UniProtKB/Swiss-Prot annotation:
It is a multi-pass membrane protein. PROSITE patterns: MFS. GO terms for molecular function: transmembrane transporter activity. This is Uncharacterized MFS-type transporter YcnB. The lineage of its organism: Bacteria, Bacillati, Bacillota, Bacilli, Bacillales. PANTHER family: MAJOR FACILITATOR SUPERFAMILY (MFS) PROFILE DOMAIN-CONTAINING PROTEIN (PTHR42718:SF24), MAJOR FACILITATOR SUPERFAMILY MULTIDRUG TRANSPORTER MFSC (PTHR42718). It comes from Bacillus subtilis (strain 168).
Length: 472
């Protein structure tokens, strides 16, 4: 049953601007501390494994909270939810800026992630609500700009700020933007979503936390501990069991926290798979290439960030344009072309040497991210368009959750292939062994891209737009 909430006339451009700005600063924080970790380790006297939790905890909190956002979006108004999310994020930023020790800084990151985890599904749901179906590609293209550009400039901005000032400046830089967006949201944001009478199921929250949290932590730990590690195996086992129990419970509940029946829509299921494949390739590539430039070519972390920046700029710039193309031609052709580009750029990456032109690598990576932009938001939009309006919050939450898991799986798979092949390279030269492993990892990436390419041919437009789908 819907809850009647007064929806006053709203300025769509204002809402879009507020949400994009809030999401940008929130998503930027995912990668903002990467190059600052050595400085934090020195100041707080912690080792690399402890410091890594500043990024791992952010990812885990996001992965745990995102599945709950479908319930939150149905329970609370879009205005209240945005203000709450930005308030939580801003509070975490303040705590981080003045953290006296490492535990407080880690707590600040978790608080930041709690706010950021709400932002992405909320932004997608609001955009899909306020834009007509024939303009959703354009809307999601703007989302693509944020999720591609924001995390990419994180390491570059971090490298500059830490060298010029201190790691605390990263929080000082973010804070005014977060405060301004919070003030604007309080004044200008309107309610645009429809509320429903729903109650939180505590057991579902617990199972979701252990399910998705276990999988994310398990897969993200493979690179550090290996597949045979008890940490990895126990985390994955707990995650799988909890997730199966979670799915079973959701199917039995009259009003589930996360509606798995979105997968009864074939187009949504296929596009979610395609989106997961391309995100796994994206995160996996962004993990392998810095290892190549820094460990094999002795390029600094800051310069590596600069090398990856053109690809992020192209991906961000092209996302809105590709969104408009999607509105005209649909997602099938874009996905086919995108996976083809990723496959073709994987071939040269399979033949990296210790003297491969760095400029050539920048060109390949930039073209590769153009292909990624042709897939990521178009297939997401195509899948959401197949859902009836009342399932859109569940579709966006499901899509973002599975993307997080897919990214961790992609990284785990490629890093484990790289490590295994490097260990059996038959050479005592460490750099040559690493190269052998990296080339093998890109062979796997090429196979994944080929699978995505073939699956893209089966993508069809939904028979009826979401507004015309019968309620279930």
């Amino acid at each position: 049953m819907n809850t009647s909430i007064e929806q006053k006339p709203f300025n769509r451009s204002v809402i879009v601007g507020i949400l994009l700005a809030g999401a940008f600063v929130a998503i930027l924080n995912q990668t903002l501390l990467i190059t600052a970790l050595p400085h934090i380790m020195r100041d707080f006297n912690v080792d690399a494994n402890q410091a890594q939790w500043l990024t791992t905890s952010f990812m885990l909190t996001n992965g745990i909270l995102i599945p709950i956002t479908a319930f939150l979006i149905e329970k609370f108004t879009s205005r209240a939810l945005l203000i709450t999310a930005m308030s939580i994020f801003t509070a975490g930023t303040v705590v981080g800026a003045f953290a006296p020790n490492f535990p407080v800084l880690l707590t600040a990151r978790i608080i930041q992630a709690a706010g950021a985890g709400i932002m992405m599904p909320l932004m997608q749901t609001v955009f899909l609500t306020i834009f007509p179906i024939e303009k959703r590609g354009q809307a999601m293209g703007m989302v693509g700009l944020v999720i591609s550009f924001a995390p990419a400039i994180g390491p570059t901005l971090s490298g500059w700020a830490v060298e010029a000032f201190s790691w605390r400046s990263l929080f000082y830089i973010i804070l005014p933007f977060a405060v301004i967006d919070l003030i604007l949201a309080s004044i200008l944001m309107k309610n645009v979503t429809t509320l429903r009478k729903t109650q939180i199921d505590i057991l579902s929250v617990i199972l979701s936390t252990f399910g998705f949290g276990g999988l994310l932590y398990g897969f993200s730990s493979v690179g550090s501990y290996g597949w045979s590690s008890s940490t990895v195996l126990i985390s994955l086992l707990v995650g799988v069991i909890a997730l199966l129990l979670f799915i079973t419970r959701q199917m039995k509940l009259k009003k589930p926290m996360l509606e798995f029946r979105v997968f009864t829509f074939g187009v949504f299921s296929l596009t979610t798979l395609l989106g997961t494949l391309v995100f796994a390739l994206l995160i996996g590539t962004e993990t392998i290439l810095p290892l190549y430039t820094q460990n094999v070519r002795d390029v600094t972390a800051f310069d590596t960030g600069l090398m990856l920046l053109p690809g992020a700029v192209v991906m961000g710039f092209m996302s809105p344009i590709i969104g408009r193309i999607f509105d005209r031609v649909g997602g099938r052709g874009l996905a086919i072309a995108g996976f083809c580009i990723i496959f073709l750029t994987s071939l040269p990456f399979m033949q990296l040497t210790d003297h491969t032109s760095l400029a050539w690598i920048v060109v390949l990576y930039t073209v590769r991210l153009l292909g990624t932009a042709m897939i990521m938001m178009p297939v997401t939009t195509a899948g959401i368009n197949a859902l009836p309006r009342h399932l859109i919050p569940h579709g966006t939450a499901m899509n973002n959750t599975i993307r997080q898991v897919g990214g961790s799986i992609g990284t785990a798979l490629l890093v484990s292939v790289m490590s295994n092949q490097a260990a059996h390279a038959g050479t005592t030269n460490v750099k040559h062994a690493a190269l052998h492993g990296m080339n093998a990892a890109f062979i796997v990436a090429a196979v994944i891209a080929l699978v995505g390419f073939l699956l893209s041919f089966t993508l069809k437009k939904p028979q009826r737009p979401a507004e015309q789908q019968p309620a279930r």
